[in-house]
């Protein structure tokens, strides 16, 4: 690009000089050709200034290495080769001095590149002891520790930053494992509670023994109920006869008379025969009835049941 610009500038310059010479030779006293020559000269000057500015910007952007390479392409002088070899040797020495162990962003030197720091066992042990005592250092402690270990303060600071990051990562892993076990324990507890809830619901849905025992006497009572076919009433076996039942069945009132007749028969069977005069007189019959009643009470009870 620069060669093209130079050739263009030289071509314009030669064209301008040629034009000026022709104009001067053809008509040296003419005033109309002088503005054209001045315009051409101004254009050539502008192009040269632009080329100089572009060359300066390229030199600043490329840097030392790029400038040396450009100079090496432009000219094969021994001075440029010596400068290139010295720059490469300096770079190799810097790489040899830098170790592998701790990332170091050395901002004090102004290089801005990432380097590796190799620590010895003694240096690592001292740094570990200091980290156990203080996880962070103030500037004075940082400088004192760097002077003690033969390091730069920036290297000590970066080592402490990395050590804190590793400690935080380990603590995060421990917390994650603890939370995982706690979640598993909560899941087991939740399953157990769900099982207990299902058992309680099944127990609530099933009939209780108290209700079953309460239903059983009602069934037995229903089995002992009797129905009168005439009055169509249901009554238990031990319930007393109702008045309406007696009205419907006046024949039940003859139970006492039949019982007295049976008592008289028993008395006759026992040898207590009423005399003939007592058979026709009510008083004597009543006395005989009382005597037979006492005999009936003394005898074994006779159970009579009337079926309707």
Swiss-Prot record:
Record SMART domains: HALZ, HOX
Keyword set, alphabetical order: DNA-binding, Homeobox, Nucleus, Transcription, Transcription regulation
Tissue note: Expressed in seedlings, roots, leaves, nodes, internodes, flowers and embryo.
Compartment annotation: Nucleus
GO MF entries: DNA-binding transcription factor activity, RNA polymerase II-specific; sequence-specific DNA binding
Residue ranges, annotated region (Disordered): 15-36, 71-117
Ranges of Low complexity composition bias in the record: 74-88
UniProt-annotated stretches for the region Leucine-zipper: 170-214
Record's keyword annotation contains Transmembrane: no
SUPFAM superfamilies referenced in this protein's UniProt entry, alphabetically: Homeodomain-like
Subunit and interaction comment: Homodimer. May form a heterodimer with HOX1, HOX3 or HOX7.
Protein name, as recorded: Homeobox-leucine zipper protein HOX2
Organism whose genome encodes this protein: Oryza sativa subsp. japonica (Rice)
């Amino acid at each position: 690009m620069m060669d093209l610009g130079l050739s263009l500038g030289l071509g314009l310059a030669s064209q301008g000089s040629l034009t000026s010479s022709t104009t001067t030779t053809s008509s040296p006293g003419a005033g109309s050709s002088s503005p054209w020559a001045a315009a051409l000269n101004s254009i050539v000057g502008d192009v040269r200034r632009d080329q100089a500015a572009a060359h300066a910007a390229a030199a600043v952007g490329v840097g030392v290495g790029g400038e040396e390479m450009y100079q090496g392409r432009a000219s094969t002088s021994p001075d440029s080769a010596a400068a290139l070899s010295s720059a490469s040797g300096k770079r190799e020495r810097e790489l040899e001095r830098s170790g592998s162990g701790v990332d170091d962003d050395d901002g004090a030197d102004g290089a801005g590149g990432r380097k590796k720091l190799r620590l010895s066992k003694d240096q690592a042990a001292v740094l570990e002891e200091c980290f156990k005592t203080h996880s962070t250092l103030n500037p004075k402690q940082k400088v004192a520790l760097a002077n003690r270990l033969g390091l730069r303060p920036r290297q000590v600071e970066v080592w402490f930053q990395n050590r804190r990051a590793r400690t935080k990562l380990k603590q995060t892993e421990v917390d994650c494992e603890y939370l995982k076990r706690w979640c598993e324990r909560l899941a087991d507890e939740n399953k157990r509670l769900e099982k207990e809830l299902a058992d309680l619901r099944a127990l609530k849905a099933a009939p209780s023994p108290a209700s079953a025992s309460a239903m059983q006497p009602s069934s037995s009572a229903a089995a002992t109920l009797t129905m009168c076919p005439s009055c169509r009433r249901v009554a238990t076996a031990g319930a007393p006869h109702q008045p309406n039942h007696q009205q419907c069945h006046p024949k039940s009132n003859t139970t006492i008379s039949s019982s007295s007749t049976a008592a008289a028969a028993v008395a006759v069977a026992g040898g207590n025969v009423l005399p003939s005069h007592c058979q026709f007189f009510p008083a004597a019959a009543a006395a005989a009835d009382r005597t037979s009643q006492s005999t009936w009470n003394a005898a074994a009870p006779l159970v009579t049941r009337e079926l309707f």
